């Protein structure tokens, strides 16, 4: 939390990567605290879609996280393209289809896939 507070204080935009990864999993309340400090929460298909690296996955955990944090503070990415995974483009297609299938609205997918990353990289200003 101290780093997120400092980032907010000095105007740095930040993202929290892999909060659902078992190695460094955060509680939803911790993610909400970071969100409230202006941090974007990264959600990736790896914890949602079974793979050789993670043979058991709970897609609803990712969906719950997006709904609880709010799409306006989430970023989505495939995190695929590694050895033994599908390539990044196919991974993203599968991830988006899964999100839509589990009830995430198309407009919210656009926000998380296009709008929020642009904001994070200061590409949203003219």
Residue ranges and their predicted role:
Residues 13-15, 38-42, 73-75:
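Structural preference for beta-strand elements that scaffold enzyme active sites
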Residues 42-43, 119:
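Ligand-binding pocket scaffold of soluble enzyme catalytic domains
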Residues 15-23:
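Catalytic beta/alpha-barrel core
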Residues 9-15, 101:
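Short, surface-exposed connector motifs at secondary-structure boundaries
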Residues 92-126:
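Mid-to-C-terminal alpha-helical segments outside catalytic/metal-binding sites
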Residues 44, 69-88:
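Short acidic/histidine-rich active-site segments
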Residues 1-7, 25-34, 51-64, 81-97, ...:
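Histidine/acidic-residue-rich catalytic or RNA/ligand-binding cores of hydrolases
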Residues 7-11, 66-69:
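Alpha-helix-loop-beta-strand connector modules within alpha/beta enzyme cores
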